[in-house]
Amino acid sequence: LHYPLRRQRQMCIRDSYYKAAGLTPYLDQLGFDLVGYGCTTCIGNSGPLQEPIEKAIQQADLSVASVLSGNRNFEGRVHPLVKTNWLASPPLVVAYALAGTVRIDISSEPLGQGKDGQPVYLRDIWPSSKEIADAVAQVNTRMFHKEYAEVFAGDAQWQAIEVPQAATYVWQDDSTYIQHPPFFDDIAGPLPQITDVSGARVLALLGDSVTTDHISPAGNIKADSPAGRYLRDKGVEPRDFNSYGSRRGNHEVMMRGTFANIRIRNEMLGGEEGGNTLYIPTGEKLAIYDAAMRYQADGTPLVVIAGQEYGTGSSRDWAAKGTNLLGVKAVIAESFERIHRSNLVGMGVLPLQFKLDQNRKSLKLTGKETLDILGLSGTELTPRMNLTLVITREDGSQEKIEVLCRIDTLNEVEYFKSGGILHYVLRQLIAS
C-alpha cells in the first residue's frame, strides 16, 4: 500500500493506525505491505514494474491500467508505462487487485475463488458498518501527538548529517541534488525592459489538457533523456537517478526535464509521443531541451502553442520555472488553468490567449512559422490588454491576429515588469 505522507520515520503514525485497527496482518497476507512513505504513487514514485512485465507492455504496446486511492490519475503518472489510471476508495483498490483486472463488474461478478473453490464476491469481503466503527475506535489522537512530539528528532542517519556552521547555505559544486539557481543572477541590474518579441520560433505545438506533469514530470528519469545524460556525466549510475521530484533543487536536472514526459505529444512531429521537437533551422528531430539550448545559443526567442486547459493538474512551480529556463517568452493557448497561468506570469513568461474561435487548427499552424508579439514596447502594461500576434509562414506570407494578454491583475503587472515574482519580492526587500 502506498499512501501520501509528508515525513518518514521508522515507525510511521499510519503504521500505528493500521496495527491498532488490526488490519496489518491481513493486508500483509494479501501482499499489501505498507511501503509507500512520502510522496510515492501520486507523484510517480511507486517504483518499477518487474522487468518481464515492462518488456511485455513495450513489445506489445499494451494499454495497461492501475487502480489507486491517490489524487492523481493523469496518463503515465503512476508509472510511465501505465496509460490508464482509475481512482477508487482504498477497499476498492484491494478488491480490484484481487480481481486482477478493471474489465469486470465487481458489483455482480466474482473477484476470484476461495480456498474451497467457491466464488468470492465484493459483498463477501466488504466490511460492515460495525466492523468499520470498531476499527476506527482503535485510532485516537494520542497516537498522532506521540509520534509528532518527536518530529524533529529523526533517526540515527538524520542525526549523523554534518551541517556546515554558516549563516547561509554552503553550495556544493559537485552536488547533483542542489545547485545554485540562476533566477537571481541579474538582480543587481536595472529592471528589465518590456519589449516586443521578434522572430520567435515554436518550441512545441501541443493539444488540449496539457498537464503540469506533461510540462514538468516528477517521476522517474530515463537514462537516455537529457536529464539522464547529465546525471551520467556527473558520475551518477542509472539505478541512483532517483526522480525529477527528488532533484527539484537542481535546476540543471529540472530544465532538462521540462517537456520531457514520455506521454507528451508534439504536433510538430505528427503527434508522436515523447519530449522531442523539430529544430526548424536544420529539420532535425531533437529533445526539446537540446533544441531550446540551440535556439538560446543564437538568441532566438521561443513560444509554446497549445489548445484548451493548458497547465491543468498539480500547481507545480517547476512547470513555469523550467519553461522560463528554456527561453520560452510566451505560451499561446486557447485557455489556461488558473494557477499555472499565474505561475507563468510569476516567472516572467507571457500567457497569451487566442480570441473568438481562433486556435492552432483554425490558423493552420504547423510550428514552422516565425512569430512576432507586438504591443509591448513603449506601452503601459495593463491587465488583460490586447496584443498583436504576427504569423509569418514558410512561404513568407503573413497573418496578423489579436490575442488576449492573460496578465490578469495589477499585482501581476508589477511582477511581470520586475522579471517575475522572485525578482519583485527580492527587490522590495532590498529597497526596504
What is each PLM-predicted segment?
Residues 71, 293, 297-337:
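Extracellular/luminal Protease-associated
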Residues 114-129, 341-415:
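Acidic, glycine-rich flexible loop/linker segments
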Residues 15-16, 33-147, 345-350, 381-384:
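Mobile "lid/hinge" segments at catalytic clefts and subdomain interfaces of large enzymes
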Residues 1-9, 13:
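Single conserved hydrophobic/aromatic residue that forms the stacking wall/gate
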Residues 120-204, 213-215:
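Flexible inter-domain linker/hinge segments
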Residues 84-85, 90-92, 215-239, 321-330, ...:
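Extended active-site and interfacial segments that coordinate phosphate-rich ligands
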